[in-house]
């Protein structure tokens, strides 16, 4: 599914949020542990607090040198928009995980395999419902502040940050390498 990094300000109905979360929870997980949690942020004040944390990222990206090709320019523009407008997007979903598998010796790679599968399902479902989403790990730069704002306990890992909304831009197919090249 194509990553969408530009969104209209229109709110996402709770029914659609529930549908993408349902799809996310159909993902595979080690031994069917389903060790994921979803934090959905739609409150404008909380979104603004979170958005303010990402502004320095947008500023930093704005100073990157011109990459020299249109594809990379679009990617940089999208990344800058994510940082500059995260707080303006109608919905932000944090896909979190609990390190619970195997029970006798939990290891992070197992937890992330479930979180990333759930995140991908969420994004594909969003596209099928006419929504846009982007898989990001921007939270890594400001994780402690996010944990404080959202009261996320230390034993819960933040795996992905997914802005969700109605696309405001191209919605065409993704361009990928031919199968023979991978």
Language-model regions, residue ranges each:
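Glycine-rich phosphate/pyrophosphate-binding beta-alpha loops
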Residues: 26-33
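Short, electropositive alpha-helical surface patch
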Residues: 146-159
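Glycine/small-residue-rich phosphate/adenosyl-binding loop
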Residues: 34, 40-115
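C-terminal helix-cap and adjacent tail motif
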Residues: 3-4, 159-182
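Glycine-rich, charged/polar anion/phosphate-binding loops
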Residues: 22-26, 76-81, 146-149, 169
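Generic N-terminal amphipathic, Lys/Arg-enriched alpha-helix
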Residues: 1-10
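Small-aliphatic-rich amphipathic alpha-helix that forms the alpha element of a beta-alpha
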Residues: 20-25, 93, 99-148
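A short beta-loop-alpha structural element at the N-terminal edge
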Residues: 11-15, 41
